[in-house]
Amino acid sequence: MHQLFRLVLGQKDLSKAGDLFSLDDAEIEDSLTEALEQIKVISSSLDYQTNNNDQAVVEICITRITTAIRETESIEKHARALVGLWDSCLEHNLRPAGKDEDTPHAKIASDIMSCILQNYNRTPVMVLAVPIAVKFLHRGSKELCRNMSNYLSLAAITKADLLADHTEGIIKSILQGNAMLLRVLPAVYEKQPQPINRHLAELLALMSQLEQTEQYHLLRLLHVAAKRKDVEVVQKCVPFLIRNLKDSTYNDIILNILIEIAGHEPLALNSFLPMLKEIAEQFPYLTGQMARIFGAVGHVDEERARSCLRYLVSQLANMEHPFHHILLLEIKSITDAFSSILGPHSRDIFRMSNSFTNIAKLLSRQLENSKADSSRRKTSTEVSIPEKLRELNSMEPESEDHEKLQVKIQAFEDKINAESNTPGSGRRYSLDHISKEERKSIRFSRSRSLALNTVLTNGVSVEDNEVEEKAGMHASISLSQIDPLSHGIGKLPFKTDTHGSPLRNSSASHPSIIHTEPETMPETFKENIQEEILEAATSPIEYQDKLYLHLRENLSKVKAYALEIAKKVPIPDQCTIEDTMRSCVAKLFFTCSLKGHYCLYSKSSFILVSQAPQPWIQVMFLSQQSLFPEPLSIQSGSVQFLKALWEKTQDTGAHSFEVAMTESTFPQQKDLEQLQLHLEEVRFFDVFGFSETAGAWQCFMCNNPEKATVVNQDGQPLIEGKLKEKQVRWKFIKRWKTHYFTLAGNQLLFQKGKSKDDPDDSPIELSKVQSVKAVAKKRRDRSLPRAFEIFTDSKTYVFKAKDEKNAEEWLQCINVALAQAKERESREVTTYL
């Protein structure tokens, strides 16, 4: 052991203890283990708790030892001695006798805890430390337990297996009120599900007492548990989840858990379907997830299939465009599983991708009739088909041409089906060599024949006027079966335009089509039937939505770009456009996505005023598209909102929102750089950062939970040190005065010097600070390379740090403290209201 350590610890000489900090870290590194063992002997003595001299010596030595370990990165070498001293603290009293008064051994435990558990990513250290850390959860003071819980939560991220053996102890601590440890349970559940399952009902009972982040971690635990397909867990958690589904904060997360359960235990949700319908009406944006639950329950048996289909069909007619795809998928999946529900009409109904309202009407009508007609459908079909053949043959003498056409259509359908499963099958067909007159003839003849084909296929007995109407309607339906734009959707078992864009109405939509004499079919039609059908299928009349079509062709690129840009530029939670004297500005509001316990922006917002609103609107549009599995249309609610914002900023004669988004979908690189530069100038990145783990922008505290315990202690300095303050009493004299500043609580304090020229030592109140920023580079000279300014309502302060790195540290800490002050004020207002 180093001679100075031997002197200080052997003789307990407090006067020499301070000299330990004059020694180089490398000089004493080999002595640290022996010094720790000597400290253990001193702290275990009978009179230690009453001997102030011994306590002071031990505290100074531990501070010097932990500093040397950190600087030399030798934690693994000295871990056993550290843990041994830490463990010895458990043999003594750790609970304070008075308020805010730690016992001597609690102080030792706290110092060693931060040294050990900050190395939560080092396995050898954590193997030794975790068993002792769990013991402290039940023996330590409230503050010690809270800090321990923070460190164990970090350890669970990378070393969950080390905590798994202590799951029972962790649960016991949670049930005793240490809810912070709930974040550990999802990580250890895979290793030790049984203890958690045994106490699941008790954990769920805590929900109403928990804070928002703790509730989130409890729901994460249920999601992990649901994936294990344990029947006992399902029975316990489904009623709980349904009860909490009306909470808009969590209903999206809860529905994802219910979808997981519906995948393997659909009957568990059957009795709750009426309640799910009510919630879907209250929160329409949940329709897509609700559809998946109803789709899963609908696969149980035919009775439940009919019940679920009625709900899904009603939603198909009422919901906005983005939900049509998932609704159709679930409807088709159920009708495929129980083919008797729709019978032979299923194929033609689902072909009609150009009108979801009509699909819903047809499905509803068929659901009403199918139950009553199911017993006699076969007989009715056999009788009606010959009658219809005779009736139609009298009107359609050119049956030979019709038969040839059907062969061509079937061949083309087979070809499209084959190509739709092959990568790169988006080949375009054209009829450039055919005249307009021939095209009209082709389209007319094709439509007639497809209408005839549909009536023959359906074979339902109807009156003549009904035949005419249905023939016209189904002629346009059939085209969607060979819609080439649907080839990229591999999940669909049927060919349909899942995006719901109505196709061009052919001449078959007119009721008189069947009674019109067929024109002679040109020879070119026989050679180019595929190209003409494809051209007709991709030429909308009713749905002239260029934005939708553009996004459909570039959806994968748009989503990939949106995901990438979201890491560089944050997406505002709210945006308003305000008129100024010169132009329009965008007022943007940013909040933290996690909203943790110490969140800087859970109740308040970071507000940014931008002189460039259009790039922000463009970024928000791309973000909106990334949230939906299907292309957005100009009629979508979110797009309409962004369009309204765009129009407020639009110059006379400039491109409309739809044109701008189609011609220049992605913002210019220089525009993005300007957005980032502006965010830097307003110090946004001091208080926000992108979390790769969460995939979202979070505030400084939520991104760095390990710092929360230090930052949030009242009176504890957030940062302190020397700064030079510019004296501006006489502006023609450039003079700097050095003071020792401390940023703590809600104030920036400094000590008044002896000179009469020194300002009063009145603190700078953070509540009065309007903004903080670095001195702009264009204003910097040799005297201001690392300066920053603080603006209050009555004064401007200019400070200079020792270097640029130190200036950045001060700026970030001041901005964090400012955000905390505003958040605290916002919470107080909320509480008062």
From Swiss-Prot:
Interacts with TGFBR1. Keywords: Cell membrane, Membrane. This is Ventricular zone-expressed PH domain-containing protein 1. The PH domain is required for membrane targeting. GO terms for biological process: negative regulation of SMAD protein signal transduction; negative regulation of transforming growth factor beta receptor signaling pathway. Residues 716-819 form the PH domain. Pfam families: PH. Belongs to the MELT/VEPH family. GO terms for cellular component: plasma membrane. Specifically expressed in kidney and eye. In the eye, expressed in retinal pigmented epithelium but not in the neural retina. InterPro entries: ARM-type_fold (IPR016024), Melted-like (IPR039888), PH-like_dom_sf (IPR011993), PH_domain (IPR001849). SUPFAM superfamilies: ARM repeat, PH domain-like. Its main location: membrane. It is found in: Cell membrane. Interacts with TGF-beta receptor type-1 (TGFBR1) and inhibits dissociation of activated SMAD2 from TGFBR1, impeding its nuclear accumulation and resulting in impaired TGF-beta signaling. May also affect FOXO, Hippo and Wnt signaling. It is a peripheral membrane protein. It comes from Mus musculus. It comes from the Eukaryota. Signal peptide: none annotated. Disruption phenotype: No visible phenotype.
